[in-house]
Amino acid sequence: MILYPAIDLKDGQCVRLLHGDMEKATVFNNSPADQAERFVRDGFSWLHVVDLNGAIEGKSVNTAAVQSILESISIPVQLGGGIRTLEGVEAWIEAGVSRVILGTVAVHDPDLVRKAARLWPEQIAVAVDVRDGKVAVDGWTGLSDLDAITLGKRFEDVGVAALIVTDISRDGALTGVNVEGVGELADAVSIPVIASGGVASVADIERLKARPGVEIAGAILGRSLYAGTIRPAEALTIAAA
């Protein structure tokens, strides 16, 4: 299992939100590049970056902060938030992003996601952000009428690298990961599934690894790392076991 430390960008700073609420942002580092370097020193092999302003505005906003991260580290970066055109995908891949995450556009224009996956095989992930059983859009400010499995099945066999499933009700709350919800999606699709939202302790990582059925490909760690409820070395050892 791959563990992805998260850097969420708001107004150029590294923050964590509670339940995706932009008004409930805690700043953890004024330098995203410095935070990225810390995660590399901790031993992580991937980095998960989200442009929060971009997710709301529908276009990349924290461009300078993302570029500073890309210039400061050598591990692969997956980036989401406001990327809704093929030109946007191409620009970030050319800038050095290893995997682009598409969320809102996956709901509204699935053909664009399929085309992106064909153009950049294994470099496109789909964000499946769930609130009250339905997939959220527009920086989690709106709800679609799709459930996670219906959305995930849209992208079978087109070269999508991963589905990143987030339980919004648990995001940033340190309340524990929704193993059942993540597992249901993983069992229903052939695309690797990455768990996000509420991963609070190494016990959550152990629960994801121990569940029967399809293996969970990864987990995103956010507030748990910043708050110190997960120690990187211990988590990485468990994930690699």
From Swiss-Prot:
One of its GO terms (molecular function) is 1-(5-phosphoribosyl)-5-[(5-phosphoribosylamino)methylideneamino]imidazole-4-carboxamide isomerase activity. It comes from the Bacteria. Its EC number is 5.3.1.16. InterPro entries: Aldolase_TIM, His_biosynth, HisA_bact_arch, Isoase_HisA-like, Isoase_HisA-like_bact, RibuloseP-bd_barrel. Its main location: cytoplasm. Pfam families: His_biosynth. It catalyses: 1-(5-phospho-beta-D-ribosyl)-5-[(5-phospho-beta-D-ribosylamino)methylideneamino]imidazole-4-carboxamide = 5-[(5-phospho-1-deoxy-D-ribulos-1-ylimino)methylamino]-1-(5-phospho-beta-D-ribosyl)imidazole-4-carboxamide. The active site is at residues 8, 129. Keywords: Amino-acid biosynthesis, Cytoplasm, Histidine biosynthesis, Isomerase. GO terms for cellular component: cytoplasm. The keyword Cytoplasm applies. Coiled coil: none annotated. It is found in: Cytoplasm. Pathway: Amino-acid biosynthesis; L-histidine biosynthesis; L-histidine from 5-phospho-alpha-D-ribose 1-diphosphate: step 4/9. PANTHER family: 1-(5-PHOSPHORIBOSYL)-5-[(5-PHOSPHORIBOSYLAMINO)METHYLIDENEAMINO] IMIDAZOLE-4-CARBOXAMIDE ISOMERASE. Belongs to the HisA/HisF family. This is 1-(5-phosphoribosyl)-5-[(5-phosphoribosylamino)methylideneamino] imidazole-4-carboxamide isomerase. It comes from Caulobacter sp. (strain K31). The lineage of its organism: Bacteria, Pseudomonadati, Pseudomonadota, Alphaproteobacteria, Caulobacterales.
